[in-house]
């Protein structure tokens, strides 16, 4: 199973890239995390947030591997604990479909894209920088994997 994080945004600071890379490299070969950066649509006076989200939607859809399960990160998504994420990871590994986590741009994700997603989850009730969400998601995926393996990284 391949885990993909499709994230709108590019040119992240080194500390974001290093943090993400640290957790991504800890994952086993059969459960690697791959990052697909999506260049955001430039905001200008003539473009509404809705227009920008629709244009980004097309780029996001192009980045999602065919047949992948889509998990959209959204502030109104379901709260998921680390243990629940581990249970989901186990289910996903058993069905063999790749999983793509989608992090939207500055205005969020297009409403039609969210309707199409297999699941909406949120990382936090707090508003976070999108780069930080990449790091936190990679850490939580590593934690979920460690829970499934009874690895000592996760302590209850």
Swiss-Prot record:
Binding residues annotated for S-adenosyl-L-methionine, in chain numbering: 73, 104, 123-128
UniProt source species: Herminiimonas arsenicoxydans
Keywords for the protein's UniProt record, in alphabetical order: Cytoplasm, Methyltransferase, rRNA processing, S-adenosyl-L-methionine, Transferase
Record GO terms (molecular function): rRNA (pseudouridine-N3-)-methyltransferase activity
Enzyme class: transferase
Localization, UniProt: Cytoplasm
Family per similarity comment: Belongs to the RNA methyltransferase RlmH family.
One GO cellular component term noted in the UniProt record for this chain: cytoplasm
Protein name, per record: Ribosomal RNA large subunit methyltransferase H
Pfam family, any one: SPOUT_MTase
Oligomeric and partner information: Homodimer.
């Amino acid at each position: 199973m391949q885990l993909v994080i499709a994230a709108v945004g590019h040119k992240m600071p080194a500390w974001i890239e290093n943090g993400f890379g640290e957790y991504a490299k800890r994952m086993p070969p059969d459960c690697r995390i791959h990052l697909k950066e999506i260049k955001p649509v430039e905001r200008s006076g003539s473009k509404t947030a809705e227009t920008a989200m629709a244009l980004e939607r097309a780029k996001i859809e192009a980045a999602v591997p065919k047949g992948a399960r889509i998990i959209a990160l959204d502030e109104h998504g379901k709260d998921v604990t680390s243990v629940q994420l581990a249970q989901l990871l186990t289910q996903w590994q058993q069905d063999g479909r790749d999983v793509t986590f989608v992090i939207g741009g500055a205005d969020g994700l297009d409403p039609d894209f969210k309707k199409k997603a297999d699941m909406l989850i949120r990382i936090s009730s707090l508003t976070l920088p999108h780069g930080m969400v990449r790091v936190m998601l990679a850490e939580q995926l590593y934690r979920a994997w460690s829970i499934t393996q009874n690895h000592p990284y996760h302590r209850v």
